[in-house]
Amino acid sequence: MTTLASSISERYIGLMSGTSLDGVDGVLVDFSGPRPMLLTDAYVPFPPALRQAFFDLQSAGHNEIHREALAANALADLYAECVAQLLHESGCDPREVRAIGAHGQTIRHQPGEHDGIGYTRQTQHAAVLAERTGIDVIADFRSRDIAAGGQGAPLVPAVHRALFALPDAWRVVCNIGGIANLTVLPPQQSDARDRVLGFDCGPGNALLDYWVHAHRGEAYDRNGEWARSGWIDAALLETLRSEPFFARMPPKSTGRDLFNPTWLQQQAGDTLERIRPEDVQATLLALTADTIADAVRTHAPRTASLVVCGGGARNGALMQRLAAQLPGTLVAASDDFGVPAHQVEALAFAWLARQCVRREPGNVYHATGAAGPRVLGTIYPA
């Protein structure tokens, strides 16, 4: 068993299960050097029943407190399995790991722009994870930022800056999970170097995954091939892009609370029945790519490159559409810059755990809109 007080290790584990509801990404990271060193990574897929349980918990339903507790327990089992894989593959003893940063599964995100302090819920059973692994667990990273008047998101800009910022050029990092978010990184040798901007810009894979599952029974559209087989419906795309969220200025955040099947049905109406399903898929892909590109043009018009991470980086059709929408900007997956696309967010939560252990702020407060820098996370000692 290891404790925050007794350990001097700079090794941390980060665990992330995002709004795509596909599974758990885990990384073991060593922070003892000038840059984070990824020692190993692991992935544990969600069983279909758990994926459905989390999807159902994103809207009101019967006996949801009980159902959330069961889902949180099941997630703790998957997190513990992911930790076991990381330790086994690296040969690392649990006592050598300072702490685990566990994000949990977002089921509600209401930062409260209109009625005071809001809330966010990343369900998990961190106490069970600490018990199973014998390692201190840091969880609930977003609540403190919201308590300070922020959006609770995005929490990854500081890590994006450490990994991807350029000395003499603007760069944008885009994480495309269920929701897409941007980090705008100024040149680090300029007077603007501290003006890091981060915000959610709209749907990522969430609507694409929903539509392909509803019509083909597949968890996701591999490489965007089904979307490639369809035609973009210009009228539907224009209707979807009329959503007021897209025009709002940062700081802003969103989730499946907004961009969900109900929203799609309300926006599109009977168009979903009149055109081919693959045409809807093509249009949803264009919605994701075009709203990301709009945000880049608006908030980082001088950017030299767009670094894409998350599951969307593996969607060739989506990456192609992004590049077409941003001529003159290099669009590439984070793998091309030395960090595998699926590891970036998990690495961020390892870093946030380290910040909490060191009692140092984890939020970029001018990106989230919080009143100031805050130490994020709740500690569950082993």
Curated annotation (Swiss-Prot):
MF GO annotations: ATP binding; kinase activity; phosphotransferase activity, alcohol group as acceptor
Here the disulfide bonds are none
The yes or no answer to whether the keyword DNA damage is present is: no
The keyword ATP-binding appears for this protein = yes
Which pathway does it take part in? Amino-sugar metabolism; 1,6-anhydro-N-acetylmuramate degradation; Cell wall biogenesis; peptidoglycan recycling
User: What Enzyme Commission number does this protein have?
Assistant: 2.7.1.170
Name the chain's protein.
Anhydro-N-acetylmuramic acid kinase
Q: Which InterPro entries match?
A: Anhydro_N_Ac-Mur_kinase, ATPase_NBD
Q: What positions does the entry give for ATP binding?
A: 18-25
Q: Which family does it belong to?
A: Belongs to the anhydro-N-acetylmuramic acid kinase family.
Q: Which organism is it from?
A: Ralstonia nicotianae (strain ATCC BAA-1114 / GMI1000)
Record field: catalytic activity: 1,6-anhydro-N-acetyl-beta-muramate + ATP + H2O = N-acetyl-D-muramate 6-phosphate + ADP + H(+)
Q: Which domain of life is it from?
A: Bacteria
Alphabetical UniProt keywords: ATP-binding, Carbohydrate metabolism, Kinase, Nucleotide-binding, Transferase
One of this protein's GO BP terms? Answer: amino sugar metabolic process
UniProt function note? Catalyzes the specific phosphorylation of 1,6-anhydro-N-acetylmuramic acid (anhMurNAc) with the simultaneous cleavage of the 1,6-anhydro ring, generating MurNAc-6-P. Is required for the utilization of anhMurNAc either imported from the medium or derived from its own cell wall murein, and thus plays a role in cell wall recycling.
Where in this chain does the entry annotate a coiled-coil region?
none
